[in-house]
């Protein structure tokens, strides 16, 4: 999980991240996230809205504890825009799930 946290930190520093369901769902064009990480405690309507958006646009989404990844911000969903960072995050989360 520490590696995922580091990748999210790089995305924050490079301004290649979206915070919150409304920002993620409202994204389009070059600002479209490649991967979305949402908290398990997210509200049902927000979760439905987020999953509908990710499924419609072919975006990978994972349910993790967002507070462990980014504790400084009270946020339930994170979208990573940078494709290379998103690919690294996807690969790391999948390897953690397979362990």
Where are these regions (language model features)?
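Short glycine-/polar-rich loops that comprise or flank the Walker A/P-loop
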Residues: 32-33, 59, 73-74
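C-terminal structural segments of small proteins and small subunits
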Residues: 67-99
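Short secondary-structure boundary segments
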Residues: 40
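Charged, alpha-helix-enriched surfaces in structured cytosolic catalytic cores
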Residues: 3, 45, 84, 88
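N-terminal first-folded block
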Residues: 3-35
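Positively charged, polar, low-complexity stretches
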Residues: 21-26, 45-71, 93-97
């Amino acid at each position: 999980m520490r590696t995922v946290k580091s990748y999210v930190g790089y995305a924050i520093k490079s301004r290649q991240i979206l915070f919150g369901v409304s920002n993620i769902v409202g994204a389009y064009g070059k600002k479209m996230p490649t991967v979305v990480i949402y908290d398990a405690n997210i509200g049902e309507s927000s979760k439905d809205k987020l999953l509908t958006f990710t499924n419609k646009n072919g975006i990978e989404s994972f349910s993790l504890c967002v507070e462990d990844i980014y504790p400084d911000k009270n946020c339930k969903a994170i979208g990573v825009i940078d494709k290379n960072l998103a690919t690294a995050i996807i690969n790391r989360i999948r390897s953690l799930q397979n362990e």
